[in-house]
Amino acid sequence: MRLGVALSTIAVLLTATSARNLDKRQWGWPNFGGGNGGNGGNGGKTINDYKREQGAGRDIHVYAPSNLAPNSPLLLSLHGMDQDPNYQQSNTHWETLADSEGFVVVYPRGGTGMSTWDIQGTKDTQWVSQIIDQMKKEYNIDTKRVYLSGFSMGGMFTYHAMSQIANKIAAFAPCSGPNVFGASKAQRPVPIFHVHGTNDDVLNYQQVEGFLKNYRDQFHCPSQADTKTNYPNRENPNATLYTWGPCDKGVYIKHLKLQGRGHSPSSADIQDIWDFVSQWTVDGPVSASGNGGGNTTPTNPSTGGNGNGNGGGNTTPTNPSTGGNGNGNGGSTDKCSSNITKQGYKCCASNCEVVYTDSDGDWGVENDQWCGCGNRVTVGSGTCSAKILQQGYKCCPSGCIIYYTDEDGTWGVNGEEWCGCGSGSSSTGGGNDAPSSGSGYQGANGTNFCNNAKHSGESVTVTSNKVGDINGIGYELWADSGNNSATFYDDGSFSCSFQRAKDYLCRSGLSFDSTKTHKQIGHIYAEFKLVKQNIQNVDYSYVGIYGWTRNPLVEFYVVDNWLSQWRPGDWVGNKKHGDFTIGGAQYTVYENTRYGPSIDGDTNFKQYFSIRQQPRDCGTIDITAHFEQWEKLGMTMGKMHEAKVLGEAGSNNGGTSGTADFPFAKVYVKN
């Protein structure tokens, strides 16, 4: 009998004293606390705020925020053995996050045996799949952003679901419940966030490493974890977060170790879980897949929209309490009138400007107010398409600029067009965000390189690793394997071709003599246009600016795009400084110390990264602005050795192939 097999297997796993019976206490019966994390009831709604439904034959408790947007995510939270949805809800309170983050929560009821889960067969995976379909019909959820988290036996089922319905679940967060079948194979590499307490006397903590290793091996994750001690879990100051990745398909496995926690669900973990799972869709990271809030940008990039929508789906300012993110651009602070506040709009934070009024001066687009806290603009004409007018939007008056971003840098605001009729534009230099497909973006010399980029001048084709120079333009091709080549032109443009390379890079730009700092050289900018062709099997990638300094020895990256399907993440550096507005766009800054090959041989050196939050294929990079931001953070720059436009791609398995063409690439200095 299937249930008997499953329960006997579970009994073996419990602890060194697992000969004891599977009583209710061991499985988190409501009176069982275990450790210091059991109550979880820090406010929030009660089960009476939920809608109780019959979900494909068994009841489910559903919570949906009153202002739920279309294409919002779904999270399913599963109780432990011999428990019920009421107990799971009263300990986790997922609805408190659902209100602020905008997603649907479902608490299903277990139905196999003693309110347990079928962790070996298909009965309950089919039922969960039917619940997802039901939520699509009732709430129009985004079926690519469905997340599964379960406690105890619900956690065991969460692992089991990886082998059955990974095509319907984007990310998995088991809590205090390992996979009882150990090496059960997942249908695909999936993101995993496992939470477990060290004082768990039901499912012993010492078993966790072995269970997680099965999946790390399956997904070909790095053997060593990035370890963060004193991780700030809400209830546990002594938590430790372990991160393995990137693994196959760019996924990560994370484990939150809670010192002293027993065998209990807790609301203290839900923010950590949500922050992880919400980064993913079934197709990969949210930022790479384009799924995410249902934003619809105007369809004609040249006449009123960029067409680069990232699916961020933000409909409120980054900081709802102040209306701004604090990264002010130094502009004037617009005062809020009572007419604005009584309508429920937020005032701008200090040092932020109101730039997102429409052309007739109303706040937002007839409804919303937005604050601009980074002077992030897109240079383009104010012409209007019929498509824009049909949606009821205003055209920008003559002399105004279209602003396509909200304050946190995401493209579009639910498809709305914005006009900036004040400050904020310049057609030269850095700080302007050019649209990837171009709407007349002008480079430093007045060239419309986003639309008209093409290679010109003398060229040299390289088919093996080489550092060289062509009429004053420095270049390099390097690869560790495969059949690779690159063509470099003396106008700075270049084209990179790689076949079956484990790691490949090519770059072109300025070389220096390591005698002057960037301040002594002058203000450094770069302009680039990227065209991707037939890119395959890329696990990690950087497109942007690359270079070195000496004294101190620093390898630096400004990453504006990537050839992989996902944005470079926390794995690039062991110190994350945070998110900053640099040159008019949002970047995440990392710092790292490593030993390895460098321009001075194998030695210790620093690595600095700025990773753009939204990729672009064309634009101007204010390199000096990144140097200055790094220095504010205590990241010392040395004497400049080089600054070049970079295309780099790598694969953890099988090699990567494709072409990254840069028909326009230029690094230059303005004094």
UniProtKB/Swiss-Prot annotation:
Reaction(s) catalysed (UniProt annotation): Deacetylation of xylans and xylo-oligosaccharides; Endohydrolysis of (1->4)-beta-D-xylosidic linkages in xylans
Class in the EC hierarchy, top level: hydrolase
Molecular function GO labels: acetylxylan esterase activity; endo-1,4-beta-xylanase activity
BP-aspect Gene Ontology terms: xylan catabolic process
EC code: 3.1.1.72, 3.2.1.8
Main localization of the protein described in the UniProt heading: secreted
Signal peptide boundaries: 1-19
Residue numbers annotated as active site: S152, E555, E648
Alphabetically ordered keywords of this record: Carbohydrate metabolism, Glycoprotein, Glycosidase, Hydrolase, Polysaccharide degradation, Repeat, Secreted, Signal, Xylan degradation
Cellular location(s): Secreted
Domain annotation GH11: ranges: 461-661
Biased composition (Gly residues): 304-314
Glycosylation sites: N238, N339, N445, N483
GO cellular component, one term: extracellular region
Keyword Mitochondrion part of the UniProt annotation: no
Acetylxylan esterase: annotated segments: 54-279
Temperature-dependent activity: Optimum temperature is 58 degrees Celsius for acetylxylan esterase activity, and 49 degrees Celsius for endo-1,4-beta-xylanase activity.
The keyword Membrane appears for this protein: no
InterPro entries, alphabetized: AB_hydrolase_fold, CBM10/Dockerin_dom, ConA-like_dom_sf, Dockerin_dom_fun_sf, GH11/12, GH11_AS_1, GH11_dom, Glyco_hydro_11
Residue ranges of the region described as Disordered: 285-328
Metabolic or biological pathway, per its Swiss-Prot or TrEMBL entry: Glycan degradation; xylan degradation
Family statement: In the N-terminal section; belongs to the axeA family. In the C-terminal section; belongs to the glycosyl hydrolase 11 (cellulase G) family.
Function in brief: Bifunctional acetylxylan esterase/xylanase involved in the hydrolysis of xylan, a major structural heterogeneous polysaccharide found in plant biomass representing the second most abundant polysaccharide in the biosphere, after cellulose. Degrades xylan from acetylxylan, beechwood, birchwood, and oat spelt, and releases acetate from 4-methylumbelliferyl acetate and beta-D-xylose tetraacetate. No activity is observed against carboxy methyl cellulose, beta-glucan, p-nitrophenol acetate, p-nitrophenol laurate, p-nitrophenol myristate, p-nitrophenol, palmitate, or beta-naphthol acetate.
Name of the protein described by the UniProt record: Bifunctional acetylxylan esterase/xylanase XynS20E
Naturally occurring in which organism (per UniProt): Neocallimastix patriciarum
Gene name per UniProt: xynS20E
